[in-house]
Structure formats: structure tokens, C-alpha cells
Amino acid sequence: MFLQRCMSFLQCIFAAVLAWIGVRGQQVHGASQFSSTGKVNPATIKVVNNVISQASATPSSVNYHFTRQCNYKCGFCFHTAKTSFVLPIEEAKRGLQLLKESGLEKINFSGGEPFIHDRGDFLGKLVQYCKHDLQLPSVSIVSNGSMIREKWFQTYGEYLDILAISCDSFDEDTNQTIGRAQGRKSHLDNLFKVRDWCRKYKVAFKINSVINTFNVDEDMRENITELNPVRWKVFQCLLIDGENAGENSLREAERFLISDQQFQDFLERHSSISCLVPESNQKMRDSYLILDEYMRFLDCREGRKDPSKSILDVGVEEAIQFSGFDEKMFLKRGGKYVWSKADMRLEW
């Protein structure tokens, strides 16, 4: 009981300080921080608990979207080309070093299209740095696959654990409708070619699919079985204000949305695929640590991307407090798995 009172007292003090200085606008606007009895408003305590949880989070797995540029125009994209900024490589390395010192185990490079900048050489140098210099257990990439060349694997493949290729349909016309294409080039030809290179250069191959209006009734079992990825990540199409929804967005993803029941039906139809890893909207919103091109954590809990200050300016410990990251949900969705190719025991 004494300990509970101490904790309650500390919460009150902390809440009072937050009420005075403000928590980046996270206070409950229009509501008093204290009730008429002098007790802290429950909504304020919730804010405090969220901040405490985020402050104690370890950035074991981080998604670094170092570029927003892309050669595809997927209609539901939630990280669109609002800027062309890319950090100088030495600054990016400094940020990655800060993350490693804070507990980073897995880095995932994404975009935009990560191979678009400097024809993949910038990406390759970061991959090499993370595996060789930082000795991270897992280094991975998410790409649309269209700009990858075998020469890249020859130079950097040994440093990469997992390569995920985004593929939403095994029908070329559907890919064209979605925007998962460049001109009339075959997205599927690239998919199979990259899969073969992954086998040749000993990189674990993964597939990411966004389930939406145009592919929700598709049966992908035969194709996924043939490709045989180590993981098939299946996402429910998600709206993010300012990215693919709202007046300032570069995409209008509303027409791609499906219901929770439609998503569940798709999962049940593909339940025989053992490598399937489903992610609903609920799981996605707060279970990822996302760094943008300025190395700011992005808080997506309110259906938009609220950035922290850059870890390059304030450090990881301070910036992560405004990430919206729920470590429990991260673990619940299976965010921690066998992510080093050295531990996968794959037959190449």
C-alpha cells in the first residue's frame, strides 16, 4: 500500500510538471489536469503512463525510411515523396551508431524505394556498415525489386540478412491498377529474378503484401508456395492522414480500404501457408519504430505521422519518448523472431 501511494504521488508530481510545460500537445485539450478533489485526471495519467512506457522502450528493431523517393505510384502508399531529402551518409552512420548504443539489434531499410538513391550504392554502404562495423544481428531491406541488379548482390549480399519484396498481386493487370508497376515492365518477372538472386547469394527472401480492394479476393496460395519465402507479411491497407488520406496527401487510399472481416477472410483462405504473418491496422499503428529521412521517430497512433526531434540532435533516449511505440504490441505481433540468416538454417 505504501509503495502504491508513493507511485501515485510520483505520478501526480510528474503529471503536474507535464501540465505546466505541456507534452508536445498530448494533453487532453479543454479538460482540467486535476479533478475537483485534487486528484489527477485519469486521462492525464494515461498520457503520463504512455510517456513512461515509451521512455523505457529499447529500440531493438527500427525501420529507417531514409528516402521518400520512389519509381512506383502505389495508390495506398503511406510514406509518400513529400521531400527529396537524404542525409549525408556519415550523418546516417552516426545515427545508426547512436541506435546501436541504445540497444539496436535489427535495422530495416525502406523508403520510398531504397535502391533509387545513388543506384543502390548508398543503401549498400549502410548495409555493409551495419553488419560489418556495427555487428548488428540483422540487417534487412524492403524494396519493390524493380531497381535491384545482380551486381549489388555481388558487392553487398554477404552483409544482408533479409530482403523483402513488395508484391500485392500475381496478376499483372491488378498490379497496374494498384500502381505497383513502372510502365509496362513486369513486376512479377522482377520478383522471381530477385528470389533467384537471394538464393544464389544467400540472402533470406521475404514477401510483403498489402491487402486491398483489388486483391482481397485473390488466391495466392500456389504462387507463394512456389516462391517459398521465409516470411510472407500480409498487411491490411492502412490510412495515414497527410500521406494517403486528407487534403494535404499525395495519395487517396480510401478506395483501397477493406473491412476487418474481408481481411480476416483473406487470412483464413491462406491459413495453410505456414510462413504467413498477418498484420491488421490495430497491430501496425503503434508496434513499429519508424525513423524518417531526418532520423525522427514517427508517432502514428492518431492516424497521422507526428515526428519527434531527430536523434541526431537530441539522442535516442529523448526522441523515442515521442515515438508512440508500444513494446508490448511489438512483441505480441511477433516483431521479434529469428531475424539473422546465420540462425535460420536455410538450404541455399
UniProtKB/Swiss-Prot annotation:
Would you tell me the Gene Ontology cellular component terms? endoplasmic reticulum membrane; lipid droplet; mitochondrion
Q: Which residues form the Radical SAM core domain?
A: 56-276
Q: What induces it?
A: By interferon type I, type II and LPS. Induced by infection with viral hemorrhagic septicemia virus (VHSV), presumably through type I interferon pathway.
Q: How does the cofactor bind to this protein, according to its record?
A: Binds 1 [4Fe-4S] cluster. The cluster is coordinated with 3 cysteines and an exchangeable S-adenosyl-L-methionine.
- Indicate which residues the UniProt annotation says bind [4Fe-4S] cluster: C70, C74, C77
Keywords linked to the UniProt accession: 4Fe-4S, Antiviral defense, Endoplasmic reticulum, Immunity, Innate immunity, Iron, Iron-sulfur, Membrane, Metal-binding, S-adenosyl-L-methionine
Tissues where the protein occurs: Expressed at low levels in spleen and head kidney.
Share an example GO biological-process annotation for this protein: defense response to virus
Q: Where in the cell is it found?
A: Endoplasmic reticulum membrane
Q: Which InterPro entries match?
A: Aldolase_TIM, Elp3/MiaA/NifB-like_rSAM, RSAD2, RSAD2/Viperin_antiviral, rSAM
Q: Which family does it belong to?
A: Belongs to the radical SAM superfamily. RSAD2 family.
Please give the PANTHER family that the UniProt record associates with this protein: RADICAL S-ADENOSYL METHIONINE DOMAIN-CONTAINING PROTEIN 2, S-ADENOSYLMETHIONINE-DEPENDENT NUCLEOTIDE DEHYDRATASE RSAD2
NCBIfam families from the UniProt entry: viperin, viperin_w_prok
According to UniProt, the name of this protein is S-adenosylmethionine-dependent nucleotide dehydratase RSAD2
